[in-house]
């Protein structure tokens, strides 16, 4: 699944999205103590009265019924805390709230790069973690235990991240606060522009942009003093991004988009007021902030950037990268282990691709075979309709075969649709949008029908398995039905699990009757090869001392990617260290757990039951997935 901008925002905001609750545990104990004292006194009073002779002339008064206090179970207490936590976290992080569809804070933009906010986030996390751990996991089971484990793990991870000064690196070409602001303010993102209140909300929120940009500059200056700066190649790419946003007038600005699309039913007086207000805001507040940021990067930041590539070149960089690897893969694998695994997988997959070349009687080495697969006209669809028909036919074949491997009850419908023309240029070959549970709309597998030579026939089967059935559509469709999960789990997710499942789904092609054509099998192998190369290159850059040029050369020598694509991939790994490892590590963990279950259960192994066990609890960290699958194996043995 290609990363959407909103998902990138969620990843980047993870460092500032923290936890909080004022925990009344001691107060509860005091209340219990008071209740016990009152009851003891009442009993003592009754005992004294009972020593007096009873009066036979008066009937005894009936004692009042004592209402027993409601005692909540641990699971109930935690459920309440999780709900309170979610509300508190959205209040702390208004941007995250907006991306989750929560509109209460659409007018707020805190300075989430400031020292004060970092301290507030730390206090938040510490308080919430203490409160949840005070209840403890004893006696919990099922989803309640999983929620506890995930919550505590995430909170401890957030606290561990504080030792690394990521706040000194607030901008790169991949995560860029300037781009976040323009996506929201242009009307193309999560910020709504439907009512007068919506327009006023953005007007108030945008007041925080200059302070946020000023703080980014302050933080980068601190990084320059501490030797914590970005690689020069990344910041060179930021300048043209800013140039594309900076405009001479409000009307030429991307921020003018909401004014171009004012609702027709908005009162004329409001239209005039909002138009004038937005013009002043864009020209006198937003654009000056962008120009100041661009000027700082060009004249101060860029000259101070480093020529080295990976995190290991920074102070405490090895430990920093090891943390990023644990956070991304949700496992205890070391960079060295992942690097070697990547080398082994690259060699294995290249051997498989060579076998395909022999099978189709191709004469030439691997680079020539790669070029043939990319350029031969037999692999090009002749029309948009032919491309769509191919995917729809593929959908029918897969859905007919998938009950052999999956219990399919409750899976939402899936539509195959072309990408809208206005999105086509930037969209991937295929992508997935989950169904809307509120109006019973289906999930959508979007097919990019533009630039047909870039959509070869041989990529279709593995792409549909990954994005559609049984990939993201099954995984996210099932997770969406878990309405009793705490919101931090329903609206969160682990990349290693989500994308690992997508890659694992690709590996099921032959079991589902696909990859019979060797060229289609090549498509699967080529995707798997790229994900394995990521293991080598990401760890090479950040823990093995590789240069950027060395990483690019490795990709060019070992895969079919173009130089342009190789440069973009390598710069992505430099910008978000460790993130690209999650895909392959997740797939390999799911495959290893299946192999373990097959080995230990023998003829009792049921692949449908295994897949249900993997998916039934939603997205979980890989270490927790391993624990729960191993418990399932033990149960099946019993």
Predicted region positions:
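Short stretches within intrinsically disordered, low-complexity N-terminal or propeptide regions
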Residues: 14-16, 44, 61-63
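Bacterial N-terminal signal peptides that target proteins for export
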Residues: 1-12
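N-terminal non-cleavable signal-anchor helices
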Residues: 4-6, 17, 67
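Bacterial N-terminal signal peptides
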Residues: 10-20
């Amino acid at each position: 699944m290609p990363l959407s901008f909103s998902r990138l925002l969620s990843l980047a905001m993870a460092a500032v999205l923290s936890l909080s609750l004022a925990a009344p545990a001691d107060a509860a104990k005091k209340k219990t103590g008071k209740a016990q004292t009152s009851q003891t006194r009442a009993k003592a009073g009754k005992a004294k009265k009972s020593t007096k002779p009873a009066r036979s002339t008066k009937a005894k008064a009936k004692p009042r019924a004592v209402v027993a206090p409601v005692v909540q179970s641990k699971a109930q207490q935690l459920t309440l805390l999780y709900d309170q936590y979610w509300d508190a976290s959205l209040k702390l992080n208004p941007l995250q709230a907006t991306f989750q569809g929560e509109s209460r804070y659409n007018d707020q933009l805190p300075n989430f790069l400031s020292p004060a906010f970092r301290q507030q986030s730390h206090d938040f996390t510490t308080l919430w973690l203490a409160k949840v751990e005070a209840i403890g996991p004893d006696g919990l089971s099922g989803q309640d235990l999983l929620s506890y484990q995930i919550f505590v793990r995430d909170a401890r991870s957030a606290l561990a991240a504080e030792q690394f000064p990521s706040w000194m690196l607030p901008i790169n070409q991949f995560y860029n606060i300037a781009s976040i602001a323009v996506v929201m303010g242009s009307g193309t993102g999560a910020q709504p522009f439907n009512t007068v209140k919506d327009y006023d909300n953005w007007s108030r929120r945008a007041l925080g942009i200059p302070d946020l940009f000023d703080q980014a500059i302050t933080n980068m200056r601190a990084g320059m003093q501490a030797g914590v700066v970005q690689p020069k190649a990344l910041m060179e790419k930021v300048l043209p991004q800013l140039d594309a946003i900076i405009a001479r007038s409000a009307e030429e600005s991307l921020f003018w988009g909401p004014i171009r699309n004012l609702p027709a039913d908005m009162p004329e007086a409001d239209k005039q007021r909002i138009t004038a207000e937005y013009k002043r805001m864009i020209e006198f507040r937003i654009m000056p902030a962008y120009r100041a940021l661009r000027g700082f990067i060009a004249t101060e930041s860029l000259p101070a950037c480093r020529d080295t590539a990976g995190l290991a070149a920074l102070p405490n960089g090895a430990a920093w990268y090891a943390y990023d690897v644990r956070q991304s893969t949700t496992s205890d694998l070391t960079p060295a282990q992942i690097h070697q695994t990547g080398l082994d997988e690259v060699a294995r997959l290249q051997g498989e691709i060579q076998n395909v070349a022999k099978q189709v009687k191709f004469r030439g080495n691997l680079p020539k075979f790669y070029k043939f697969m990319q350029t031969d006209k037999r692999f090009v669809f002749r029309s948009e309709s032919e491309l769509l028909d191919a995917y729809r036919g593929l959908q029918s074949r897969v859905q007919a075969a998938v009950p052999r491997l999956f219990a399919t009850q409750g899976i939402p419908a899936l539509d195959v649709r072309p990408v809208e023309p206005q999105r086509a240029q930037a969209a991937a070959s295929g992508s997935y949008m989950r169904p809307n549970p509120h109006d019973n709309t289906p999930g959508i597998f979007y097919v990019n029908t533009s630039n047909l030579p870039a959509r070869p026939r041989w990529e279709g089967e593995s792409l549909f398995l990954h994005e559609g059935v049984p990939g993201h559509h099954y995984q996210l469709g099932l997770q969406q039905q878990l309405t009793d999960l705490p919101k931090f789990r329903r609206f969160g997710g682990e990349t290693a699990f989500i994308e690992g499942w997508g890659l694992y789904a690709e590996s099921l092609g032959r079991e589902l009757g696909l990859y019979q054509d060797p060229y289609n099998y090549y498509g699967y192998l080529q995707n798997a090869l790229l994900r394995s190369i990521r293991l080598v290159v990401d760890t090479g850059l950040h823990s093995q001392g590789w240069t950027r040029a060395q990483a690019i050369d490795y990709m060019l020598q070992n895969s079919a990617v173009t130089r342009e694509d190789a440069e973009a991939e390598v710069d992505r790994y430099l910008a978000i260290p460790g993130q690209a490892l999650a895909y392959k590590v997740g797939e390999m963990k799911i495959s290893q757990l299946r192999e373990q279950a097959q080995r230990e259960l023998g003829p009792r192994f049921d692949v449908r039951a295994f897949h249900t066990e993997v998916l039934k609890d939603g997205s979980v960290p890989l270490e927790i997935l391993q624990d729960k699958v191993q418990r399932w194996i033990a149960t099946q043995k019993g």
